[in-house]
Amino acid sequence: MEYSLAVKRHFAAPKRARELPAGSSGLVAGEAEDRSLHVWVRFQLQIVDETIAAAGFQAFGCPHTVAAASVVADWAEGRPIAEVRKLDVKTVCAELEIPVEKLGKLLRVEDALVACCRS
């Protein structure tokens, strides 16, 4: 499989691939997985005054999954939680030039973010 330059960049040096400090005020977490697709994603968000003050992620999966989680975490930081809740992973697919057949894996990225926003 050939990967876009953006996927290669995010996979080689993912942005915000980190665990946020335990006990931080406003810290929420959410995760999603699909063992049949070999994918697991976990986001942590620190929410201060309805805004994402910090975002971090952990991911297991193919380069597309890791790159998408990197883009989403980077995009979310600094945005209002209401805006983050409206993320459409298809936009991330287009930005990273990810083939539509990988959408099932990327939906787990969206599911993890939604779970985080519900916390």
Please provide the spans of the model-predicted regions.
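Domain-level signature for proteins that mediate thiol-based redox and metal-cofactor handling
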Residues: 1-119
